[in-house]
């Protein structure tokens, strides 16, 4: 089975609404072993929608649409799908009864145009929608072609697909696709591509790198007659990739870097405090996202001015005068100072120039120093980021968390 995901709606075409439905459907279809060969977005125009159906069926046998099932004149999906398969629309009395009950239970007034949602071809397989007023449907045409019509709102579309479409589609496939995601930080997409380039041509399993935000994900996908067989195909490939990428792999699946670091801190009972300048508390804020971090996170200080660095952290006046606030020496004293004052095993410091102004030839915008004081031993790292203010701050925060992760993994 080959499928196309088609979003119908001018609001998506114009970018007013983000099409999250396509991502959900692509993942779910992959899990069923159904290949998605194309995704498209079509405006609310009869001629263009029919043309899109024509083009899609040149390469696939199944079209899954989202949107266009509402009560207004520009909701055209099911009418045009019926026209494409030469089916006649008729009032489905059972749907009208359900719709009237829905409005009564929710104390809403049912207008005449709402009845439009109860018209489907008599051949249509109806997909119930307990979360809204627009039922979905499956229309089966000749030559094993079908159009699956789903509502646009994700809270309606997702349960409808899971509860009704998945059992229907399962009858047409004898294999499954299973994916394993490895999350990588510390090397860019191009560098990782160099390290695993010979594996990218593999067919089963396939290996594909993707840049996502600041980190990179590596997806290993295998096809098998069942989940167990697919996972057995993935295992040796994963082992080889881990051997090549080492501790640049920080997690699997949907785990975030902050979750990995938070868990390490809590599991190892490593108390921590932060002193930040250009990041303005981003490291502290990100760590606090982890549930249970209160066991180990003691204090976070935003010491933006030189006076604050001296008063709160004990940075020496001579250090600031001789080396400046953005320096290895200042970052070192900041990390030591916050660890001492907060009485924590770890002190984190950040000082830098996020921009857009404030840079010099010697100390350009994007120059950042970070310090880690762990059990009295202090290390400092220098970063140079070529980016705008927000990206400099975000990249600093992520790199410091990754550095902390690697240091924590060395501690028994």
UniProtKB/Swiss-Prot annotation:
Xref: CDD domains: cinA (cd00885)
Pfam families for this protein: CinA, CinA_KH, MoCF_biosynth
InterPro entries, per the entry: CinA (IPR050101), CinA-like_C (IPR036653), CinA_C (IPR008136), CinA_KH (IPR041424), Competence-induced_CinA (IPR008135), MoaB/Mog-like_dom_sf (IPR036425), MoaB/Mog_dom (IPR001453)
SMART domains from the UniProt entry: MoCF_biosynth (SM00852)
Gene3D superfamilies named in the record: 3.30.70.2860, CinA-like, MoaB/Mog-like domain
SUPFAM superfamilies: CinA-like (SSF142433), Molybdenum cofactor biosynthesis proteins (SSF53218)
Family: Belongs to the CinA family.
Name used for this protein in its record: Putative competence-damage inducible protein
Organism: Clostridium perfringens (strain SM101 / Type A)
């Amino acid at each position: 089975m080959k499928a196309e995901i088609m979003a119908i709606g001018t609001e998506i075409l114009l970018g007013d609404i983000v099409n999250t439905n396509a991502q959900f459907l692509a993942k779910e279809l992959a899990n069923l072993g159904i290949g998605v060969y194309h995704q498209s977005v079509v405006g609310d125009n009869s001629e263009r929608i029919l043309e899109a159906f024509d083009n899609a069926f040149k390469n696939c046998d199944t079209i899954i649409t989202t949107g266009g099932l509402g009560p207004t004149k520009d909701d055209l999906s099911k009418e045009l799908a019926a026209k494409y398969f030469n089916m006649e629309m008729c009032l489905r009395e059972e749907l009208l009864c359900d719709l009237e009950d829905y409005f009564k239970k929710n104390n809403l007034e049912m207008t005449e145009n709402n009845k439009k949602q109860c018209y489907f071809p008599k051949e249509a397989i109806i997909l119930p929608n307990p979360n809204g007023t627009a039922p979905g449907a499956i229309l089966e045409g000749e030559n094993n072609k079908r159009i699956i019509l789903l509502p646009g709102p994700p809270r309606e579309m997702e349960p409808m697909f899971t509860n009704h479409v998945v059992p229907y589609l399962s009858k047409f496939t004898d294999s499954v696709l299973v994916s394993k995601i490895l999350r990588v930080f510390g090397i860019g997409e191009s560098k990782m591509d160099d390290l695993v380039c010979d594996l990218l041509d593999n067919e089963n399993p396939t290996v594909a790198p993707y840049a996502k935000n600041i980190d990179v994900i590596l997806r290993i996908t295998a096809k098998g007659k069942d989940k167990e067989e697919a996972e057995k195909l993935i295992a040796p490939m994963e082992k080889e990739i881990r051997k090549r990428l080492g501790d640049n792999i920080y997690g699997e699946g949907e785990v975030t870097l902050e979750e990995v670091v938070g868990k390490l801190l809590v599991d190892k009972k490593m108390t921590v405090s932060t002193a930040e300048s250009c990041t303005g508390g981003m490291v502290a804020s990100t760590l606090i996202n982890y549930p249970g971090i209160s066991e180990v996170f003691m204090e976070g200080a935003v010491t933006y001015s030189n006076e604050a660095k001296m008063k709160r952290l004990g940075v020496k006046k001579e250090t600031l005068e001789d080396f400046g606030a953005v320096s290895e020496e200042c970052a070192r004293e900041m990390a030591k100072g916050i660890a001492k004052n907060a009485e924590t095993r770890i002190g984190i410091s950040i000082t830098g120039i996020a921009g857009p102004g404030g840079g010099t030839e010697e100390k350009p915008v994007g120059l950042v120093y970070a310090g880690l004081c762990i059990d009295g031993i202090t290390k400092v790292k220098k970063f140079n980021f070529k980016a705008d203010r927000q990206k400099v701050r975000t990249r600093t925060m992520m790199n410091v968390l990754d550095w902390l992760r690697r240091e924590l993994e060395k501690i028994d």
